[in-house]
Amino acid sequence: LIMDNPFIGLDAVTRELLYTVLEKLAQLASLQIVLVLSMLDDIPSFITHVVPVDNKTVGEKMPRAAYLQAFREQDALRAEADAASLGELQQRIAGLPYENTNFTSDEVVRLNKVSIRYGDRTILKELDWTVMRGQKWALSGENGAGKSTLLSLVCADNPQSYACDIRLFGRKRGTGESIWEIKKHIGYVSPEMHRAYLKNLPAIEIVASGLHDSIGLYKKPRPDQMSICEWWMDIFGIGHLAQQTFLKLSSGEQRLVLLARAFVKDPELLILDEPLHGLDMT
């Protein structure tokens, strides 16, 4: 049984369920299990051996306990280096290349008694939600709770939004605005976008596509815009991947490219749906 990052995207209850199933299966002498994992905490107790893979190099096989001990010893050394890097990163972020101060409204999002149904299934029922300028929100809930559906209303990706009482950036939906007039204010990344983004362009062009909210790049960026794309790629530690084609990158590298894409236009509203999905501990 081979599973590649099986815990990604699962809520706490489902993770525990999968862990229990794998634990029971591991007791079968006739079954061998190989898990490909990015997070140290995802290594189950029933795993007997760990093979570290770093920078496309396979390390020496180690018993699980020995690997965890060695990792924690190295982690203490990494923490000091990471603290220095974090301080440098914070200084760079403080010097953003530009800052968007052209806010369209103090009321960024307002949903009034919003309900979403698919057939007989109700996803959202009479939801009220207001996001004001300067606020930072976290949506928390189990898989299937309706978080992504809620975000699709804000991102103008749900056709049912036209039948709902929704105001975005001070303007009521369905009063003549286009989807693109809404999207130009929003930076967005999600697992669904990741799966759908199949353009095999250089990574920096994927980042640049965020300037125009397009899947693919159809308008040549100005030199100053390309500089901003490079700046954000450096911030996310992927500057060296700028000319690598997107589909040849690892899933984690692709996610970092799409995160840079979400930030690149200095959006008025930044929506990150499961932003750590598929990223390693670093």
Regions found by a protein language model. Name each.
Residues L259:
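Hydrophobic anchor residue at the start of the ABC signature
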Residues D165-E181:
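ABC ATPase NBD Q-loop/coupling interface
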Residues L1, P191-K248:
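ABC-family P-loop ATPase nucleotide-binding domains
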Residues V109, I123-E126:
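Conserved structural motif at the start of ABC-family nucleotide-binding domains
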Residues S140-E142:
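The feature captures the beta-strand-to-loop junction immediately N-terminal to the Walker
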Residues N55-G87:
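Conserved beta-strand-loop-alpha-helix hinge in the C-terminal portion
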Residues I2-N5, L270-E274:
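Catalytic Walker B motif of ABC-type/P-loop ATPase nucleotide-binding domains
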